[in-house]
Structures are given as structure tokens and as C-alpha cells.
Amino acid sequence: MMARDEENPAVPRVRTGKFSFTCANHLILQISEKMSRGQPLSSLRLEELKIVRLICVLLFHRGLETLLLRETMNNLGVSDHAVLSRKTPQPYWPHLYRELRQAFPGLDFEAAVFDETRAARLSQRLCHPRLSGGLLTRFVQRHTGLPVVFPEDLARNGNILFSLGTLYGHRLFRLAAFFTRHWGAEAYEPLIRIICQKMWYFYLIGTGKMRITPDAFEIQRSRHETGIFTFIMEDYRTFAGTLSRHPHRPHPQQQQHHHPGPPHPPLSHPASSCLSPEAVLAARALHMPTLANDV
């Protein structure tokens, strides 16, 4: 469980930046330093690597649960299929059909869909909490690799398949699938490292293990373009004296063909510029809602 210790006076804290105070746990401080500097995941000890991966999986798990709960609440009392499927990508339905065929191997779906009596009977079977809950768990695990067990109250909802479709099209769903599929692959390590960085600092802030001063959010909002987590990591590196440890140097060809426009934030480590074409395409797919099934 993600218990907060922000208000616990017994937890000692140390200043880790101009805008941050972190609990004085040696392991947390050691991982935070490596995460802020963008060191390769191979530089982490096995103990540290297990902790980082466990936290990422935990956050994905809780995030998917929260998103499904939100969509279920939004769909309460709605019976219009056009409204229910407005945020459901088209590739979701073939995947759901294959999942239903595996759940009901002896059922003639073509006959059940066009016969009201059989359709009503199938709907009653799908409303059974154990059956629908297992269907949800298998679908999410098949596409993300995460064994998420949803509460029976969610599985009992009549619009749960539409809520699941919205979850399928969400970027967090694709990010979880990307993380579990490419964890440990050297070609994707720079991208997995960026995910671990953001997840780690989100976990520290969310659980109260790192306290951020209120003025940090005001300064970040007006002067920073890459988000609060990158802002906190830069502040962490500045305080530790490692901000320029890996300066970003553009390629000479990029300097010759430079076009005016807003600067793109560099990745956190020089190795991130050596991504394979497959890794680049996979990263771009994370930003395309219609390509959720391709991640």
C-alpha cells in the first residue's frame, strides 16, 4: 500500500534541493540521486532495480484501477451506445471478441447477437461478478502484462465493457504495456529509464517521502516547459552539483540545419540518442490513440 508519511514528525528529512526535502533513508536517497542524474538502469544494484520496478508496477496497477473506476462512474445511468463508445478505439472490439470467444468456447456468438433471447441470456452471464471480473483481469493482463484484479463492484456494472474500452485507449494503458514488454531490453533502456525517473519521483511525492515547497509549483508553471518532475530532478542535480554532468551537445548536422522554433527538451542521458528505429517507432505509438493495439 502507498502509505503517506508526510505528516509523521518522527520521519527525519534532509534538504535535497532548493524546493525539496526527502526522508533520510539511505536507500531512497541513493536511488533518487541515480534517477536524477539519468544513469543507466544497469548502474543500479539488484536491490535498487527491484525496488524501482516494483514501484512502477504498483503505480501502473493503481492507475489502471483508478481510471476504470472513473470511467465506470462516468457511464453510470447511460444507455446510449453512441455515448458509451465515444472514447473507445475501434481496435478494442476485435480484441474483446477474441476474449469472449475464449471465455465461452461453445457459444455461437453470431446467433446470440441477432437473437434477443440469447443476447439477454449472454448479458446475464456476463453480469456475474466472478465471470466478468475474470474477463477484465485476463484482458488487462494479456495486453499489459499486469495481473490487475478489479473489485466486484466494478465488474458487476452493466457498462463495464465500454469502460474497459476507454481504459484500453488511454495512454497509461499503452505505457504500462510498453513498460512490461520492453523491461530488460537493452534497445529500449533509455525509454524505460525515463519512465522509471518520472514514476520514482511521482511515488516519492505521492507518498510524502519527498516534500515539495509550494513556491516550486509557481515557478515551474511560469518558467519551465518540461513538467514538475523534470523541474524537481534539475533542482536535485543543481543542489548536488551534478547538473552539468552530462551536458547536451547537439549533433553538428543538427546545428547546420537548425530551424527556428521552441526547443525540444533533451533526454536525460546521452545513450538515449542511440535508440534503435524499433524503439523510436514504439515511443511514437505511445502518443497515438488509434495505435493502442500496436504497442
From Swiss-Prot:
Pfam family, one: Herpes_UL79
Keywords, ordered alphabetically: Host nucleus
Major place of residence: host cell
GO CC, one annotated term: host cell nucleus
Localisation: Host nucleus
Keyword NADP: no
Region (Disordered): 243-273
Biased segments, Basic residues type: 245-261
Family, as annotated: Belongs to the herpesviridae UL79 family.
Main function: Plays a role in the expression of late transcripts bridging viral DNA replication and late gene expression during infection. Functions concordantly with UL87 to initiate transcription from over half of all active viral promoters in late infection, without affecting host transcription. Acts on and binds to viral early-late and late kinetic-class promoters.
Protein name per its UniProtKB record: Protein UL79
Upper classification of the organism: Viruses, Duplodnaviria, Heunggongvirae, Peploviricota, Herviviricetes
Gene that this sequence comes from: UL79
